[in-house]
Amino acid sequence: MKPGIHPEYGPVVFRDRSTGTQFLTRSTATSEERVEWSDGNSYPLIVVDVTSASHPFWTGGRQVLDTQGRVEKFRRRYGDRARGGQ
């Protein structure tokens, strides 16, 4: 790889918002928020809505996610225009 043009790639903890499950992996994503991991080190924390711990495809079940906030945000942003301008 050419030096100086690629983002830094390091350890990051991803936390599933709905289940609280945490995954330590590597990513170019960063965060100011940090979390203490079981190895005693502190890593950047990124909170995500869906992971393999909560997605129905991976869990084999059906889990209702909180989409009310998304729907309300959409309605505030687009209002009646979303219904075809009626």
Curated annotation (Swiss-Prot):
GO terms for biological process: translation. GO terms for cellular component: ribonucleoprotein complex; ribosome. GO terms for molecular function: structural constituent of ribosome. It comes from the Bacteria. Keywords: Ribonucleoprotein, Ribosomal protein. Pfam families: Ribosomal_L31 (PF01197). InterPro entries: Ribosomal_bL28/bL31-like_sf, Ribosomal_bL31, Ribosomal_bL31_B, Ribosomal_bL31_sf. NCBIfam families: L31 (TIGR00105), PRK01678.1 (NF002462). Belongs to the bacterial ribosomal protein bL31 family. Type B subfamily. HAMAP family: Ribosomal_bL31_2. Part of the 50S ribosomal subunit. PANTHER family: 50S RIBOSOMAL PROTEIN L31, CHLOROPLASTIC, LARGE RIBOSOMAL SUBUNIT PROTEIN BL31C. This is Large ribosomal subunit protein bL31B. It comes from Saccharopolyspora erythraea (strain ATCC 11635 / DSM 40517 / JCM 4748 / NBRC 13426 / NCIMB 8594 / NRRL 2338).
